[in-house]
């Protein structure tokens, strides 16, 4: 098994606590509202905390697919959230899981800095994700982040 790590950082004009609420606490209901391709996020097992399994259903290339998220950490006090994608329809068979560790902190002018660590765990001697795949995955993640940021900005009473 290989482990391939990618670090990323993105800033927002939205305050950390409000952004965390949109990205984590309310994500299951907000995300399908702000991203057309995402049809639903539902809890399959658990209560939303560590160990919870969520099913995210989406449409890609005209085909309905889903991935399973396993929640590993929900730390509201420290604005941290960790989860792994552990399977699903359309999930690469060469990958065991993709783990995400996210943390929000105070940024300039009352905004936020989001730090993200992504680890790809490949099966056997499978190759690392291609540069094209990494760029595609980053674009999807950035798109989700910015869509939820736009929601917060468009709804100033959201807190």
Curated annotation (Swiss-Prot):
Protein's UniProt keywords contain rRNA processing: no
GO cellular component terms listed in the entry, alphabetical order: cytoplasm; nucleus
UniProt-recorded Gene Ontology molecular function terms: abscisic acid binding; protein phosphatase inhibitor activity; signaling receptor activity
Induction: Upon contact with the plant pathogens fungus Fusarium solani, Pseudomonas syringae pv pisi, and the fungal elicitor chitosan.
GO biological process: one example: abscisic acid-activated signaling pathway
Record keywords, A-Z: Pathogenesis-related protein, Plant defense
Species whose genome carries this gene: Pisum sativum (Garden pea)
Gene3D superfamilies in UniProt: 3.30.530.20
Pfam families found in the cross-reference section: Bet_v_1 (PF00407)
Family classification: Belongs to the BetVI family.
Keyword Ubl conjugation in annotation: no
Protein name per the record: Disease resistance response protein Pi176
InterPro entries: Bet_v_I/MLP, Bet_v_I_allergen, Plant_def-hormone_signal, START-like_dom_sf
């Amino acid at each position: 098994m290989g482990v391939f790590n990618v670090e990323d950082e993105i800033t927002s004009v939205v305050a950390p606590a409000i952004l965390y609420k949109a990205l984590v606490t309310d994500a299951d209901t907000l995300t399908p509202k702000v991203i057309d391709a995402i049809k639903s996020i539902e809890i399959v097992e658990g209560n939303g905390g560590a160990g919870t399994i969520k099913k995210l259903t989406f449409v890609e290339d005209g085909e309905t697919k889903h991935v399973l998220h396993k929640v590993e950490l929900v730390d509201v006090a420290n604005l941290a959230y960790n989860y792994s994608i552990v399977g699903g329809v359309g999930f690469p068979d060469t990958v065991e899981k993709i783990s995400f560790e996210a943390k929000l902190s105070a940024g300039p002018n009352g905004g936020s800095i989001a730090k993200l660590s992504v680890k790809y765990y490949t099966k056997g001697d499978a190759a690392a994700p291609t540069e094209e795949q990494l760029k595609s995955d980053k674009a999807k993640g950035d798109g989700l982040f910015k869509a939820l940021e736009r929601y917060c900005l468009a709804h100033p009473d959201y807190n």
